[in-house]
Amino acid sequence: MARVTVEDCIDKVDNRFDLVLLAAHRARMISSGSPITVDRDNDKNPVVSLREIADQTIAPEDLKEELVHSLQKFVEVDEPEPDTIPLIGSAGASVDADDTEVAVERMTEEELLKGLEGLAPPEEQPEEEE
């Protein structure tokens, strides 16, 4: 029997690197007990997987999808979007459905100055000469 080469498979999978990834993944699947779709002919699993790709008994798109799923560490879950929060001070801000108003607390200038007096000034650090 003639040996399977990359040239036999390159018209099925355009990129040689993708072909190697897919064939290796299929060979691991065969090693873990997945049934083969071509005669083994005393060939090893990587050769059998290349022959399956060349004979189109296995779809490369399906292999690619299985490879991606096998490499995923986290399952993507579609979570609901959080409620949108209107921007503060935007002129066209939408009003909530329940029409509740937000109470804004006003400070006088004297209250503001008293609050600022309570703050400690930042410590001055000596300037370093270079």
From Swiss-Prot:
CC terms in the record's Gene Ontology section: DNA-directed RNA polymerase complex
Keyword DNA-binding: no
Ribonucleoprotein keyword on record: no
Bridged cysteine pairs (disulfide): none
GO molecular function term, any single one: DNA binding
UniProt-listed Enzyme Commission number(s): 2.7.7.6
GO biological process: DNA-templated transcription
InterPro entries linked to this entry: DNA-dir_RNA_pol_omega, Pol_omega/Rpo6/RPB6, RPB6/omega-like_sf
EC category name: transferase
Stretches for region Disordered: 110-130
UniProt keyword annotations, A-Z: DNA-directed RNA polymerase, Nucleotidyltransferase, Transcription, Transferase
Pfam families cross-referenced by the UniProt entry: RNA_pol_Rpb6
Catalytic activity annotation: RNA(n) + a ribonucleoside 5'-triphosphate = RNA(n+1) + diphosphate
Described purpose of this protein according to its UniProt entry: Promotes RNA polymerase assembly. Latches the N- and C-terminal regions of the beta' subunit thereby facilitating its interaction with the beta and alpha subunits.
Subunit structure: The RNAP catalytic core consists of 2 alpha, 1 beta, 1 beta' and 1 omega subunit. When a sigma factor is associated with the core the holoenzyme is formed, which can initiate transcription.
Family membership: Belongs to the RNA polymerase subunit omega family.
Protein name: DNA-directed RNA polymerase subunit omega
Natural source organism: Afipia carboxidovorans (strain ATCC 49405 / DSM 1227 / KCTC 32145 / OM5)
Lineage start: Bacteria, Pseudomonadati, Pseudomonadota, Alphaproteobacteria, Hyphomicrobiales
Record gene name: rpoZ
